[in-house]
């Protein structure tokens, strides 16, 4: 057995009786300074240990989200109707997706970007429309030509006023004209405007009555609107919306639609019967947006190759006057990749202040077609996108903290001979930025901490010894002189 006496002999820290030690004011002051300096260096070392240390590298894109990329957007068009707003995607590989509706929502807005109705569903407006057989036979005008003055008077006089807003240069308006005039004559014979007085079919030439067409937010030709009791506005759960007809444009379909509108109305009192219910004859009537603007929001999935996201007016059975199209828009949100929660993004910005500065470059910006640009103006955005990924090596394993796509944006306006559009041209970089978080080891922190405390203690002891010996030497010299 090892005796306690022998064990004590290896003690590195032998104690000196307190009675044999001497305290001094200089030693006390130096001890206080040393203690404060230790605390300061300890705080600095702790801050350095807790600080995120990163390395940045540029590598070939190794995205975990495959060959497709998600684009989220929320864009407001003050002068583009939801009736015709279309979201299209194309790329250099030949992909062309027109009028995407599955992941896109449209809401009518006013010129001040305020919502004016519920979500607009354009399914009925986009089916293949039957115009009947083309014929060169001319029919007598059955529909009444309307002007701004006569429109107001007749819309207040007839319970039902069905109006065809058209343009003479429009191919689809000319296709509709024979069927429309024939149907108008049939309706006039069945429901005499003077004797019956329940319904009237009219025409508005938008080249001669542009103010009337603009007031009714006509953007595509022909547009068939139904006006009830002096106004095309109907109350529906707090939202005012007008009715538009999107059905077939042959004579029989138009007559059937009008008869379905007239059926619930009493011929003498011109009041809607209490048991009047909608039926299949009016199934192609749809409440349209009351204002001429539209907020388009949602997302699309695109291939990771250069491509275009295009928002424009589109219809397979309407024509548009390109000189009157205004593609001004305000971008509320536009981003690439999966949506990042605000909390996660806030945490990452706290750790990495330079992260997330360019993932929403277009957000909150307005692109307005000023008058000096003239007509037929397309607004283009050129977006160059690069992926940034942050990974950590804590707990001995490497895992991804966040993935985001940042982009630069350059915008311009250009006059075109074609229909104006809002185009977002995106080009993805084949490289990605990899930010690696390298945590410091706890053993390294403890080692530095011991070095700091021990070093300060030792240096303070040396300084105290030098000062004490110097004072003693000075006293001895003074004592020798006195002798």
UniProtKB/Swiss-Prot annotation:
Residues 133-263 form the Thioredoxin domain. InterPro entries: Erv (IPR045888), Erv_C (IPR012936), Erv_N (IPR039542), Thioredoxin-like_sf (IPR036249), Thioredoxin_domain (IPR013766). The chain crosses the membrane at residues 442-462. Disulfide bonds: none annotated. Keywords: Glycoprotein, Membrane, Signal, Transmembrane, Transmembrane helix. The active site is at 170 (nucleophile). Its main location: membrane. GO terms for molecular function: protein disulfide isomerase activity. Glycans are attached at residues 53, 74, 99, 279, 326, 376. The keyword Mitochondrion does not apply. It is a single-pass membrane protein. PANTHER family: ENDOPLASMIC RETICULUM-GOLGI INTERMEDIATE COMPARTMENT PROTEIN, PROTEIN DISULFIDE-ISOMERASE 5-3. Acts as a protein-folding catalyst that interacts with nascent polypeptides to catalyze the formation, isomerization, and reduction or oxidation of disulfide bonds. This is Protein disulfide-isomerase 5-3.
């Amino acid at each position: 057995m090892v005796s306690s006496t022998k064990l004590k002999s290896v003690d590195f820290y032998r104690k000196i009786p307190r009675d044999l030690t001497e305290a001094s004011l200089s030693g006390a002051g130096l001890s206080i300074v040393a203690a404060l300096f230790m605390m300061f260096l300890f705080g600095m070392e702790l801050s350095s240990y807790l600080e995120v240390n990163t390395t940045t590298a540029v590598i070939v894109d190794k995205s975990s989200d495959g060959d497709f990329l998600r684009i989220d957007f929320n864009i407001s068009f003050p002068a583009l109707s939801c009736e015709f707003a279309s979201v299209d995607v194309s790329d250099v590989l030949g992909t062309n997706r027109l009028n995407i509706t599955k992941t896109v929502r449209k809401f009518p807005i006013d010129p001040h970007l305020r919502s004016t109705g519920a979500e607009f569903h354009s399914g009925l407006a986009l089916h293949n429309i039957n115009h009947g057989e083309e014929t060169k036979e001319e029919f007598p005008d059955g529909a009444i030509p309307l002007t701004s003055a006569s429109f107001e008077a007749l819309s207040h006089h007839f319970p039902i006023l069905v109006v065809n807003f058209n343009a003479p240069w429009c191919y689809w308006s000319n296709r509709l004209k024979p069927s429309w005039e024939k149907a108008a004559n049939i309706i006039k014979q069945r429901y005499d405007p003077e004797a019956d007085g329940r319904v009237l079919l009219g025409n508005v030439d938008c080249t001669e009555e542009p103010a009337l067409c603009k007031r009714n937010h006509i953007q595509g030709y022909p547009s068939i609107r139904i006006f009830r009791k002096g106004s095309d506005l109907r109350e529906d759960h707090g939202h005012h919306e007008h009715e538009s007809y999107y059905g077939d444009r042959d004579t029989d379909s138009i007559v059937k639609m009008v008869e379905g509108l007239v059926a619930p109305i009493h011929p003498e009192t011109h009041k809607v019967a209490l048991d009047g219910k909608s039926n299949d004859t009016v199934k192609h009537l749809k409440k349209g947006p009351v204002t001429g603007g539209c907020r388009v929001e949602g997302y699309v999935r695109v291939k990771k190759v250069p491509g275009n996201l295009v928002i424009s007016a589109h219809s397979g059975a309407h024509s548009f006057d390109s000189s009157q199209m205004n593609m001004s828009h305000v971008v509320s949100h536009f981003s690439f990749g999966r949506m990042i929660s605000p909390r996660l993004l806030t945490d990452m910005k706290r750790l990495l202040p330079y992260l997330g500065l360019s993932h929403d470059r277009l957000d909150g910006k307005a692109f307005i077609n000023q008058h000096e640009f003239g007509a037929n103006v397309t607004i283009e955005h050129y977006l160059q996108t690069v992926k940034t990924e942050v990974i950590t090596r804590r707990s001995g394993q490497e895992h991804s903290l966040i993935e985001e796509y940042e982009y630069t944006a350059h915008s311009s306006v250009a006059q075109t001979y074609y229909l104006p559009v809002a185009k977002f041209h995106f080009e993805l970089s084949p490289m990605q930025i990899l930010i690696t978080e390298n945590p410091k080891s706890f053993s390294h922190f403890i080692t530095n901490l011991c070095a700091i405390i021990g070093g300060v203690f030792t240096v303070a002891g040396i300084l105290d010894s030098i000062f004490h010996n110097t004072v003693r030497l000075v006293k001895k010299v003074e004592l020798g002189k006195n002798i």
